[in-house]
Amino acid sequence: MTDNIHKHRILILDFGSQYTQLVARRVRELGVYCELWAWDVTEEQIRGFNPNGIILSGGPESTTEENSPRAPEYVFNAGVPVLGVCYGMQTMAMQLGGHVEGSNEREFGYAQVEVKTDSALVRGIEDALSADGNPLLDVWMSHGDKVTAIPSDFVTVASTETCPFAIMANEEKRFYGVQFHPEVTHTRQGLRMLERFVRDICECEALWTPAKIIDDAVERIRQQVGNDRVILGLSGGVDSSVTAMLLHRAIGDRLTCVFVDNGLLRLNEAEQVMDMFGDHFGLNIVHVPAEARFLDALAGIDEPEAKRKTIGRVFVEVFDEEALKLEDVKWLAQGTIYPDVIESAASATGKAHVIKSHHNVGGLPKEMKMGLVEPLKELFKDEVRKIGLELGLPYDMLYRHPFPGPGLGVRVLGEVKKEYCDLLRRADAIFIEELRRADLYDKVSQAFAVFLPVRSVGVMGDGRKYDWVVSLRAVETIDFMTAHWAHLPYDFLGRVSNRIINEINGISRVVYDISGKPPATIEWE
């Protein structure tokens, strides 16, 4: 029997901050399981989860407004430690008898907090000392409202020049509020504060580790599927690859992977997937060459969302046909990860907007009565990569730049044709090869080439050519919500451009995209 890796757990109530998932990832990094729920949960749900501690996230609302989100009253009666972050601190203060006011001045960016009262949350943690010998902490603020009076049974632990209550605490009840964001890297000692709360104050053990997550997943897969057969759509991406390796470890040859080669993959990617998973790891893989079918379906379609939906529809059709050929398959495996679960829950409650349609397996034929196996559904992407390494998958594959589900279908602008895909594949491969050679690949967050359906005049030797244009795109980002274009060296860009134009017959011009996000998105379509 494996350890119960869910025995100690933290509940994070989400008030809408862009950083909330980061809070959860930090808690997981500390080796403790946590879940992220909407703020309006019931007492019964909290009791059922039985957390060792609760974190109230930040959020964009104002506690001074009527009908603004509030923590359930039971949070403060559950007998477990509570940490309020930014908005979470403000609603804690207001609900427990303090006072919050709107401010004409937003405090956004770095601040230095001076600790004036001893507290279990920050004891022994400091970045520097004040002239009076008090600990100073470099933190990241992002708030408009501020607490102007703390509840009567709380003490002020720390303050800044403009924020009199930067940290408040009720040590007896183990309630803590911080006006800054400990989860972001700009708060230099933030992870230590979260560790103090989660590991010391909430007394959680570090049971959530890659090796134990794998053991737990394998055991749960075996319990769920028994001696049945399982089918998985393997794309070669991180999520489906790690799902395949977990299932293979759990049930061996009773897993069948279906790899649909849609003709929209990167250079040599289909061969690499078959070599790695079929020849090297010995998985049972059905290779379905379907390039012509996808390109026929995409003929005449130039609108991005229509292309996405067409690619998704044809994928489901092809996958369904292959699934029906297999006998006695009772389960469908999917590489759903925890952010997908969070997004689905938000969509179901009307708290999120769909910006782009997701490319995923769905709509299996009604005659196929299959159960769903989702071994990654509790994991964030960084956790999936770590267990992939533990399972033996190569680092370069797990830490590749993101690649869209529809593949080159949304990197060829306008109508998708085989000629365009072939040119783009080779241009993209040269760009990535040169990034790796110059030790720049891991210094940018994402890099790729885009095919532009416009012709441009060029000169080759004594002749003129009238060929296609390719754009290079490279960005730097922390969360992919915002991004800066990567300032790659001019000589590097010149070398990439020369190679693409000289080595690929059909491309006469290379341009570099210098648009940030916002206003542009990272992908062109």
UniProtKB/Swiss-Prot annotation:
Molecular function GO terms recorded: ATP binding; GMP synthase activity
Residues in GMPS ATP-PPase domain copies: 208-400
Keyword tags: ATP-binding, Glutamine amidotransferase, GMP biosynthesis, Ligase, Nucleotide-binding, Purine biosynthesis
Pathway(s) it belongs to: Purine metabolism; GMP biosynthesis; GMP from XMP (L-Gln route): step 1/1
Catalysed reactions, as listed in the record: XMP + L-glutamine + ATP + H2O = GMP + L-glutamate + AMP + diphosphate + 2 H(+)
Superkingdom of origin organism: Bacteria
Keyword Ligase: yes
Listed GO CC annotations: cytosol
Name this polypeptide is given: GMP synthase [glutamine-hydrolyzing]
